[in-house]
């Protein structure tokens, strides 16, 4: 049996601009800003040679359909041109569906682990591009993998997959702590398919990215994230109440993750 392991951080998007017009899927993505966090997903893959491909995915030990992960496995096995029974075990340390980049982390860590296990010899960016493609096709993310591949507090200046899109980093102290809590899910696929939400994002997202580039700080990122969340209208009363309480206690410009009740 062949085994390999890889890690990918979680990621919180504060605001973004949809950039999915290009025909080339590697040029599709988003401009935006957010932060990668230490907690994420550790993925272990196990492979046994077989007469035909079979894929099993476990999330924290529980069998799951996991279409994004299975899509990554399909891409990687096609490159290997061999058949295997593949078991993928995601050790997930972040909430799923809460806007903390679980789908991107699962996709990227799976691709990294399979690149090792299958001895494909792909570069880091080429591996990340596979995860990016799968996210775009499944409508589970636009720029998350680009951000996760770089880490830190980022501005996604140019859309596209890793190696094509461009990320610049906002300098922060090494002891900076991100405080977040999650109370529910918002399905990214539904949000990206909602024309009304898309129109609101397109109206404001790009302007906020340009504003942050001019004045790049984590304080400005949080301020613009809050403005974005308020203007696209996704904050429910529970989120608004929590943010007010946080601000009363010194957490200035607390905001909402895109997309999740986080």
Description of each model-found segment:
Residues 165-262:
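C-terminal nucleotide
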Residues 100-124:
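DPxDG-like acidic metal-binding loop motif
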Residues 124-168:
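Alpha/beta catalytic cores of group-transfer enzymes, especially the acyltransferase/condensing modules
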Residues 7-9, 36, 148-149, 180-184, ...:
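Short beta-strand segments
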Residues 82-94, 129-134, 239-249:
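Short, hydrophobic/aliphatic alpha-helical segments
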Residues 2-3, 31-34, 98, 135-137, ...:
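A generic local secondary-structure boundary/capping motif
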Residues 1-96:
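ATP-binding N-lobe of GHMP and related small-molecule kinases
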